[in-house]
C-alpha cells in the first residue's frame, strides 16, 4: 500500500512536469523527511532540474507544487525551500489500511519463475556446527520470503556422499570395527567415529593410501557392499542433521546426493562440453587466466577420479535444466570457487548461479567454551539459547505456568537465534551476544512480546474481525506512525525478495514492534470512544507481526 502512495506521487509530479513542458527521464526519488512536520514524503527533484532549467531550485519547486493534482490519499502538498513535501490524509488512509489487512497480507501475485535454492549442504560427517548456522537460517528465511513474493521455490541440501570425510568413516568402521553409539544423536555419533578415525590417520599417515583406494572404488561404483557402507553412514548422519534443522524450523524440499551426478553420466556430459577449453596433463584442468582468475579449476585427478568441483558443475547443470533461477548461499571464503564454477558453467552453456555470500559468526570469549578447538554444535547452541530464554522469563516473573515457561522458552530461544542472524546484512560478520539476542527491548523477544500483547488485548475485547470500520477522528503521532509502518510491509517483502536480503524484513519487523508498543503504551483501546478502530489497528498489527516473524522462520507465541 505504501508503494502505491509513492507511485501516485510520482505520477502527479510527472503530470505537473508535462504541464510545465519539462522533460525529465530520471527516477524521481522520494524520501521520508526527518521531521513529521515536514510531511510524510518529500522529493528534491528541483535540485536535479536547476542546472538544466537555469532557475533556482526554490522557484522550480514552487512551480511544480502549483501544478500538482493531489493524489487521493494525500491532504496537502507544500514546499520548504527546494523540497516538495506531501502530507498523507490519515483519516482516509487509515480506513483503507486497517480494512485491507488480513491473514494473507503481504502475499504477492504468483510469478512464473522457478527458483532452486541450495543452502546448508554441510558434509555428513558430524553434526551441524555454528559455522553452518548462518547459511541454514539465511537460506530458509530467503526461501520463505521468495515464496511469499510469488516465486516457486525449492530448497535443496546437496549431500556430499563422495567426500574424503565419508571414506575415512567407512574405512575406520571396517578396519577398526568402530561403531556408532546408539544412545547418542545420530550425527553426533558419526562425528565421534570420524574423530577416532582421524586420530588413527594422524598417528599412521601411511593409511591415507587406503582412503584413496576406497574413494576410487566408490567412484567406480562396482562394489555393492562399499556403496551400502557409504550410504549407510551418510543416511544415518543426515537423519541427525534433519532433527537439528527441524529444531530450527527449517524444512528442505529435497536432499540431492552428489553421487547421483556421477552415476547418471552428468559428470561425463559436463566434462565433454568443457573439452575444447580444458588441458590434459597429469591432471585435467580448466585454465582461467583469460578471465582474470589466476587459479585453474582442476576437474580430474591423475588417477582419473573426479573432484568435488566437477560433480558440483554437474549438479549446477541439473539446476539449469530444472529451474529459471539458481540461488546458492555460500560463505565468503567460497568466492574464488564460486567464480571458477560460474565461468565453467557459462563455458559449458549452463547458467551461473546467483550467490548470496555471508561472513561468519564469532562467539564472544567465555560465552561458550570451544573446548580447545572442538566445534560448538548447533544442538548445543540451541540448548544454550533456550536455557538463557528460560532464565530471562523466570527473572521477569511473567504470569506463566511452568508448562507455558517451557513452551515459550523454546519459541523465544530458537527465535532469538534466527532473528539475531537475520537482522544483520550478510556482508557483515556477527559476534553473537546473548544479552542482545534475548533482549525484551531490542531483540526477537520484544517482537514476540508485542504479538502476545496484541493477542491478549483482542482476547479481552468484543472484537469482530469481520466488521469494517471508518476512521473519523484526527490521529495522534503514535497512531500515524503505526499506520504508516503497517502499510510498508509489502514493499519490504518486495525489496527483500529482489535484493535477496533477509535483513530488510528483520529490521522492519523490529520497527513495527516498536511502533506498536508506543501505540499500546500511549493509547487506551478498550473502553475508548475509538475502540472499534483501535481494535482493528491492534489486529492489523498482530497479523503483520505474525506474518513477518513467520517469513523469518520464527514462531509467534500468543502468551508471554
From Swiss-Prot:
Give the UniProt subcellular location, in the record's own words: Cytoplasm
- Which InterPro entries does this one have? aa-tRNA-synth_I_CS (IPR001412), Arg-tRNA-ligase (IPR001278), Arg-tRNA-synth_N (IPR005148), Arg-tRNA-synth_N_sf (IPR036695), ArgRS_core (IPR035684), DALR_anticod-bd (IPR008909), Rossmann-like_a/b/a_fold (IPR014729), tRNAsynth_Ia_anticodon-bd (IPR009080)
Gene Ontology MF terms in the entry: arginine-tRNA ligase activity; ATP binding
Tell me the Gene Ontology biological-process terms attached to this UniProt entry.
arginyl-tRNA aminoacylation
- Pfam families per the record? Arg_tRNA_synt_N, DALR_1, tRNA-synt_1d
* E.C. designation(s): 6.1.1.19
Q: Which residues form a coiled coil?
A: none
Asked whether the UniProt record includes Ribonucleoprotein among its keywords, one would answer no
Q: Where is this motif: 'HIGH' region?
A: 122-132
Annotated catalysed reactions: tRNA(Arg) + L-arginine + ATP = L-arginyl-tRNA(Arg) + AMP + diphosphate
Q: What is its main location?
A: cytoplasm
Which UniProt keywords are listed?
Aminoacyl-tRNA synthetase, ATP-binding, Cytoplasm, Ligase, Nucleotide-binding, Protein biosynthesis
GO cellular component, as recorded: cytoplasm
SUPFAM superfamilies in the cross-refs: Anticodon-binding domain of a subclass of class I aminoacyl-tRNA synthetases, Arginyl-tRNA synthetase (ArgRS), N-terminal 'additional' domain, Nucleotidylyl transferase
What does the sequence similarity comment in the record state about its family?
Belongs to the class-I aminoacyl-tRNA synthetase family.
Q: What is this protein called?
A: Arginine--tRNA ligase
Organism expressing this protein natively? Methanosphaera stadtmanae (strain ATCC 43021 / DSM 3091 / JCM 11832 / MCB-3)
Amino acid at each position: 500500500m505504501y508503494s502505491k502512495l509513492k507511485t501516485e506521487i510520482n505520477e502527479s509530479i510527472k503530470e505537473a512536469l508535462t504541464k510545465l513542458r519539462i522533460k525529465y527521464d530520471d527516477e524521481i526519488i522520494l524520501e521520508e523527511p526527518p521531521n513529521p512536520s515536514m510531511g510524510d514524503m518529500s522529493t528534491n527533484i528541483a535540485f536535479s532540474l536547476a542546472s538544466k532549467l537555469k532557475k533556482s531550485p526554490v522557484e522550480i519547486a514552487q512551480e511544480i507544487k502549483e501544478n500538482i493534482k493531489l493524489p487521493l490519499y494525500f491532504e496537502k502538498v507544500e514546499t520548504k525551500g527546494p523540497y516538495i513535501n506531501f502530507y498523507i490524509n490519515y483519516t482516509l488512509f487509515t480506513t483503507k489500511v486497517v480494512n485491507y489487512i488480513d491473514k494473507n497480507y503481504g502475499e504477492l501475485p504468483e510469478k512464473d519463475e522457478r527458483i532452486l535454492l541450495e543452502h546448508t549442504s554441510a558434509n555428513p560427517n558430524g553434526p551441524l556446527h555454528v559455522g553452518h548456522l548462518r547459511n541454514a537460517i539465511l537460506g530458509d528465511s530467503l526461501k520463505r520470503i521468495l515464496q511469499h513474493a510469488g516465486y516457486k521455490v525449492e530448497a535443496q541440501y546437496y549431500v556430499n556422499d563422495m567426500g574424503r570425510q565419508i571414506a575415512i568413516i567407512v574405512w575406520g568402521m571396517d578396519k577398526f570395527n568402530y561403531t556408532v553409539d546408539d544412545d547418542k544423536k545420530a550425527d553426533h555419533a558419526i562425528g565421534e567415529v570420524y574423530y577416532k578415525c582421524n586420530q588413527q590417520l594422524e598417528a599412521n599417515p601411511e593409511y591415507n593410501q587406503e582412503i584413496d583406494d576406497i574413494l576410487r572404488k566408490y567412484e567406480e561404483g562396482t562394489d555393492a557392499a562399499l556403496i551400502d557402507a557409504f550410504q549407510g553412514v551418510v543416511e544415518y548422519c543426515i537423519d541427525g542433521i534433519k532433527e537439528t534443522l527441524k529444531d530450527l524450523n527449517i524444512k528442505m524440499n529435497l536432499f540431492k546426493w552428489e553421487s547421483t551426478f556421477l552415476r547418471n553420466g552428468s559428470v561425463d556430459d559436463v566434462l565433454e562440453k568443457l573439452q575444447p577449453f580444458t588441458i590434459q596433463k597429469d591432471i585435467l584442468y580448466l585454465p582461467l587466466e583469460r578471465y582474470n582468475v589466476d587459479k585453474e579449476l582442476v576437474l580430474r585427478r591423475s588417477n582419473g577420479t573426479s573432484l568435488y568441483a566437477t560433480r558440483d558443475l554437474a549438479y549446477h547443470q541439473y539446476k539449469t535444466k530444472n529451474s529459471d533461477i539458481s540461488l546458492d548461499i555460500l560463505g565468503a571464503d567460497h568466492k574464488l570457487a564460486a567464480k571458477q564454477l560460474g565461468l565453467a558453467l557459462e563455458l559449458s552453456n549452463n547458467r551461473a548461479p546467483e550467490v548470496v555470500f555471508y561472513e561468519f559468526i564469532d562467539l564472544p570469549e567465555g560465552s561458550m567454551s570451544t573446548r580447545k578447538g572442538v566445534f560448538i554444535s548447533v544442538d548445543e547452541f540451541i540448548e544454550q539459547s533456550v536455557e538463557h530464554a528460560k532464565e530471562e522469563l523466570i527473572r521477569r516473573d511473567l504470569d506463566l505456568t511452568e508448562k507455558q515457561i517451557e513452551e515459550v522458552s523454546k519459541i523465544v530461544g530458537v527465535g532469538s537465534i534466527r532473528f539475531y542472524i537475520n537482522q544483520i546484512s550478510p556482508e557483515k560478520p556477527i559476534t553473537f551476544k546473548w544479552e542482545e539476542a534475548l533482549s525484551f527491548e531490542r531483540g526477537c523477544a520484544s517482537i514476540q512480546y508485542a504479538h502476545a500483547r496484541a493477542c491478549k488485548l483482542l482476547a479481552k475485547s468484543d472484537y469482530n474481525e469481520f466488521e469494517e470500520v471508518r476512521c473519523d477522528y484526527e490521529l495522534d503521532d503514535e497512531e500515524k506512525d503505526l499506520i504508516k509502518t503497517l502499510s510498508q510491509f509489502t514493499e519490504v517483502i518486495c525489496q527483500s525478495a529482489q535484493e535477496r536480503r533477509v535483513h530488510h524484513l528483520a529490521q522492519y519487523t523490529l520497527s513495527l514492534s516498536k511502533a506498536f508498543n508506543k501505540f499500546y503504551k500511549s493509547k487506551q483501546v478498550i473502553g475508548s470512544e475509538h475502540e472499534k478502530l483501535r481494535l482493528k489497528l491492534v489486529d492489523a498489527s498482530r497479523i503483520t507481526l505474525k506474518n513477518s516473524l513467520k517469513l523469518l522462520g520464527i514462531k509467534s507465541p500468543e502468551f508471554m
